[in-house]
């Protein structure tokens, strides 16, 4: 028997819970190790607030919020020889970005990316897109480097050096970072 106390609020709450259930179940399948979860940490005085610092060997990204204070996130980084190093700026930010492999990726891995050769096809944004929920585009001197800080469909890659060069984050973590970081932010990858 259906209760007459079934209000609009109850309907909305029940519907929202139902929509989130698949995401919740998916998130429960893999728990990121504790050290790679976002946490506030102290950083050196020499690191200016308002910038991103990425330490690929330790698989951490730091958003420096204030003097001596940063949010540290675990990341996945590029395989040896494919990683980005140096300084860039975030010139573009996108929610649920489209994706296509770079020409170098197509050449390096034709078995995986051959269907993209000789065309401009791109995968639309969405839950199965390798760039995940958000992407921050790295530029040098106004030119796209084709390196990104982005979400991932492979959360187990966090803490590993397995990508084609980009910096991968858990989708909820990159969404949090996306909201904090403005266009023009300096990114240093050591």
Task: For every predicted segment, state its role.
Residues 23-27:
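Sec/Tat signal peptide C-region and signal peptidase I cleavage site
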Residues 141-143, 154-156, 174:
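Short Gly/Pro-enriched loop/turn and capping motifs at secondary-structure junctions
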Residues 167-190:
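N-terminal targeting pre-sequences for secretion and organelle import
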């Amino acid at each position: 028997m259906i209760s007459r106390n079934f209000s609009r609020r109850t309907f909305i709450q029940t519907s929202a819970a139902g929509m989130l259930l698949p995401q919740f179940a998916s998130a429960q399948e893999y728990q990121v190790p504790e050290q790679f979860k976002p946490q506030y940490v102290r950083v050196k005085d020499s690191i200016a607030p308002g910038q991103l610092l990425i330490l690929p060997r330790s698989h951490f990204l730091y958003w420096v919020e204030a003097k001596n204070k940063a949010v540290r996130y675990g990341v996945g980084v590029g395989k040896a020889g494919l990683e980005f190093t140096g300084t860039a700026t975030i010139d573009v930010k996108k929610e649920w970005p489209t994706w296509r492999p770079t020409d170098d990726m197509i050449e390096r891995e034709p078995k995986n990316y051959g269907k993209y050769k000789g065309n401009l096809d791109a995968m639309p944004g969405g839950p199965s897109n390798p760039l995940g929920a958000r992407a921050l585009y790295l530029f040098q001197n106004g030119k796209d480097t084709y390196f990104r800080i982005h979400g991932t469909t492979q959360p187990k890659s966090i803490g590993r050096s397995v990508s084609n060069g980009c910096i991968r984050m858990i989708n909820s973590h990159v969404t949090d970072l996306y909201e904090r970081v403005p266009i023009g932010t300096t990114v240093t990858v050591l």
